[in-house]
Amino acid sequence: MLVGYLGPKGSFTHDVATHSFPTSERIAYRTITDVIKAYENQEIDFAVVPVENSIEGSVHETLDYLFHQGTIQAVAEVVYPIKQQLLVTKKDRPIRTVYSHPQALAQGKAFLRAHYPDVAMEMTASTAYAARYVAEHPDLEIAAIAPLAAASEYGLEVQAKDIQEIEDNYTRFWILGAKEPAISETLSPVLQKVSLALTLPSNLAGALYKGLSTFAWRGINLTKIESRPLKTALGEYFFIIDLLNEAPDLLQFAYQELDSLGIQTKVLGQYQVYTIKDNGMEKR
């Protein structure tokens, strides 16, 4: 079995793929879109991509591709504790530029302002790419914000540990595929969820309220709602909602009511949620 992930080695996504599929062959891709397209081209059996961070919010590249272009769905979710490290080729040298993924830069911004107020920040496709770039340029006064695994992967030193702005920092990762995967027995499911994209009719007054009411009066709990541009005209949106899948039969009736209201529904995923332990504590 082949599993694709947002690479390179040492990225958070690589660690999630390793925890979830410890015995499978894993293939790194440069961008989230590349990972999903690899699945669509039948190069891999499952794709592992980030979908939401508890601090920075949704990963729009993932959600927008799945809504606008993708036919693939989420078949499992893994929640991973995020710890960011400041990595260098040699400790205690001046740092002029810090490289990382945009969300990692945002998570480490407060630390950088406090300890390196004049440092420049440059974006990369992933935290691990930043670590690899720093390792490949040992003569430059640069650093990377990346996971601890990237330090050992690329031979870097930890200049500062756990620099994330908020300690309670987690990222949801989706495993995309055609069927429910055989997740490692070291991970246990904690709940079941469904993710939907709703497109509202323009001629239905109170369309969003009526759409959400189909779940509310059936006692189906929402855990998230978010709007994204339809990319058709200014002010036109679709809505992403996450639901607890505790009553599948009721959910089917809700789908029927949405259809009767003229609300288009696209299932982005139906999946079990797994957690990776952080210092012995399971986190959702």
Regions found by a protein language model. Name each.
Residues 1-284:
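Domain-level signature for soluble enzymes in the chorismate/prephenate branch of the shikimate pathway
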